[in-house]
Amino acid sequence: MLKELKLLDGKTWDYNELLDEMLKDDFYYGYLGKAALSSSSLKKLLQSPKAYQSSLTESQTETKALREGKLIHLLLLEPHKEEILTVVPVKSRTAKAYKDAAAIDGPENTFTETEYMAAKRVAKAVKSCPEAWEMIYGAATEVPVAGNIMGLPFRAKADILH
């Protein structure tokens, strides 16, 4: 089994310590997003080296579908994180109240009531489907793993494992 992993920044990590840190979103998407490769970074590399470099230095545009998907994912697989969300009782993200809340709590954690309720309906529908809920209930979620592929450090998180 892997005992240590050397990352792209040259730092060597104890494997178990790295896995523990990977449970923290700020570490996983922040530091490790630049210090290790992932399937997402490989997609950017396949586009061009410039696209990869831009993904490291520039904020990425979040599509409506990705934003909705992240919220549904959180509600189903990480319900303990629901408490970090700010739900603003407006219909549009162009509303002043939404913009004010997003400036304080971050746009990634701020949703309109309309967005939130739509995601809650989808999550409820999934939970109401016995076949789907059986796959989710009691499973381990957001399970981190790291390792070397062809001598390069990679990171990943399994959404769900039974």
Where on the chain are the PLM-derived regions?
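Active-site beta-strand-loop-beta-strand hairpin of nuclease catalytic cores
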Residues: D159-H162
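Metal-dependent nuclease catalytic cores that hydrolyze phosphodiester bonds in DNA/RNA
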Residues: M1-K157
